[in-house]
């Protein structure tokens, strides 16, 4: 069981501030979490191989090939409307004002 003082110390280390009644609730919640951890620590996992992937499939990796990465011209070809030419020149998307 985590005491009220221990809960206050943990809260201070985490830079949290609690009201007096909230510290007791925090203490109870931490105690519950620590009890769950104790239960997990009791499980014997010595003969269990660690799971590294949920899929047993072999993932084919593609070769790392350097290609031209300047796609801005293609991207700005899709811009339409009155501001299309300006957007292509400055390479920014021009949108209507959203926030006043």
Swiss-Prot record:
Protein name: Aspartyl/glutamyl-tRNA(Asn/Gln) amidotransferase subunit C
Reactions catalysed: L-glutamyl-tRNA(Gln) + L-glutamine + ATP + H2O = L-glutaminyl-tRNA(Gln) + L-glutamate + ADP + phosphate + H(+); L-aspartyl-tRNA(Asn) + L-glutamine + ATP + H2O = L-asparaginyl-tRNA(Asn) + L-glutamate + ADP + phosphate + 2 H(+)
Task performed by this protein: Allows the formation of correctly charged Asn-tRNA(Asn) or Gln-tRNA(Gln) through the transamidation of misacylated Asp-tRNA(Asn) or Glu-tRNA(Gln) in organisms which lack either or both of asparaginyl-tRNA or glutaminyl-tRNA synthetases. The reaction takes place in the presence of glutamine and ATP through an activated phospho-Asp-tRNA(Asn) or phospho-Glu-tRNA(Gln).
Keywords, ordered alphabetically: ATP-binding, Ligase, Nucleotide-binding, Protein biosynthesis
Gene Ontology BP terms: glutaminyl-tRNAGln biosynthesis via transamidation; regulation of translational fidelity; translation
Top class in the EC scheme: ligase
Quaternary assembly: Heterotrimer of A, B and C subunits.
Entry GO MF terms: asparaginyl-tRNA synthase (glutamine-hydrolyzing) activity; ATP binding; glutaminyl-tRNA synthase (glutamine-hydrolyzing) activity
InterPro entries: Asp/Glu-ADT_sf_sub_c, GatC
Xref: Gene3D superfamilies: Glu-tRNAGln amidotransferase C subunit, N-terminal domain (1.10.20.60)
E.C. number(s) listed in UniProt: 6.3.5.-
Cited NCBIfam families: gatC
Top-level taxon of origin: Bacteria
Pfam family, one: GatC
Family the entry assigns: Belongs to the GatC family.
């Amino acid at each position: 069981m985590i005491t009220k003082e221990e809960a206050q110390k943990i809260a201070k280390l985490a830079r949290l501030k609690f009201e007096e009644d909230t510290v007791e609730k925090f203490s109870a919640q931490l105690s519950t979490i620590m009890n769950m951890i104790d239960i997990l620590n009791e499980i014997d996992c010595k003969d269990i191989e660690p799971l590294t992937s949920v899929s047993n499939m072999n993932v084919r990796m593609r070769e790392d090939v350097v290609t031209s990465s300047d796609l801005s011209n293609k991207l700005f070809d899709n811009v339409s409307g009155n501001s299309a030419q300006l957007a292509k020149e400055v390479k920014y998307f021009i949108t209507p004002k959203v926030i006043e």
